């Protein structure tokens, strides 16, 4: 915080100092996943709205508790991802609603890379409970699919971990080891309320692949949706 304050000429304050500041109405919560609920809850108790990084909480029960508290306090809580509101997500939705590919019946999404330890300065939390490929990045894909297809009815999945230890190759901690405490590969399928079925592959155990990020198959055509980590991108339709 001190380094950022010096670089951008802003104040570095503790969490308590920020929460006690009456001029601040909205908290942007960019802490690690394990701290999300605590910061959101403290923000609400101090009369402040909160927009948080994903995931909203460590589990479903905590998420419901946050929703209940926000409603009781009459405050707003938002959470990433919001990329589905961008041009690509909204254009894809418009095309589906206009029946350009017919009813969506099948699909795939693939999130495949070799993790975060090669670029992030402090990547440990990515491999702890509350993170991993689904909670950290997969939620962008799932949110986009809910935007395009609707609610999920059920899920089937298996998970695994390729290695129990990762080596940091980014600076300033090059060579340090990370203990892996959450699955780094998850594979499965989503069944939506409209009976569409989407197969998924989320992993940080793959060096390279040539899969599209999201492909949707309708009764009258197919659609390739661009990477939902971004707000824009090229949509491809084939018939």
Tell where the protein language model's regions lie, with residue ranges.
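Contiguous beta-strand/loop segments that form the cofactor/metal-binding neighborhood of enzyme cores
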Residues: 143-234
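Predominantly a Rossmann-like dinucleotide-binding segment in NAD(P)-dependent oxidoreductases
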Residues: 83-179
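Beta-strand-loop-alpha-helix segment that lines the small-molecule cofactor/substrate pocket
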Residues: 26, 32-33, 37-84, 99
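NAD(P)-binding Rossmann-fold cofactor-contacting core
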Residues: 1-5
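Short, structured coil segments at secondary-structure junctions
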Residues: 7-8, 46, 148
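Short acidic low-complexity segments
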Residues: 10-22
């Amino acid at each position: 915080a001190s380094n950022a304050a010096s670089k951008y000429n802003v104040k570095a304050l503790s969490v308590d100092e920020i929460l006690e500041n009456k001029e601040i109405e909205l908290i942007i919560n960019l802490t690690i996943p394990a701290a999300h609920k605590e910061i959101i809850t403290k923000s609400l108790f101090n009369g402040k709205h909160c927009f948080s990084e994903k995931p909203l909480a460590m589990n479903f029960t905590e998420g419901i508790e946050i929703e209940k508290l926000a409603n009781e306090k009459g405050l707003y809580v938002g959470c990433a991802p919001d990329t589905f509101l961008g041009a690509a997500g909204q254009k894809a939705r418009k095309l589906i609603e206009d029946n350009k590919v017919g009813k969506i019946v099948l699909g795939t999404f693939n999130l495949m890379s070799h993790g975060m330890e090669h670029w992030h300065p402090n990547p440990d939390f990515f491999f702890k409970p509350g993170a991993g490929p689904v909670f950290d990045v997969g939620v962008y894909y799932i949110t986009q699919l809910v935007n395009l297809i609707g609610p999920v009815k059920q899920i089937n999945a298996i998970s695994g971990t390729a290695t129990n230890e990762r080596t940091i190759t980014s600076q300033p901690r090059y060579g340090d080891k990370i203990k892996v405490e959450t699955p780094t590969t998850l594979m499965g399928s989503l069944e939506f309320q409209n009976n569409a079925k989407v197969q998924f592959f989320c992993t940080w155990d793959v060096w390279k692949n040539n899969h599209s990020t999201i492909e949707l198959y309708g009764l009258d055509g197919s659609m390739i949706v661009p990477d939902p980590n971004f707000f824009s991108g090229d949509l491809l339709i084939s018939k």
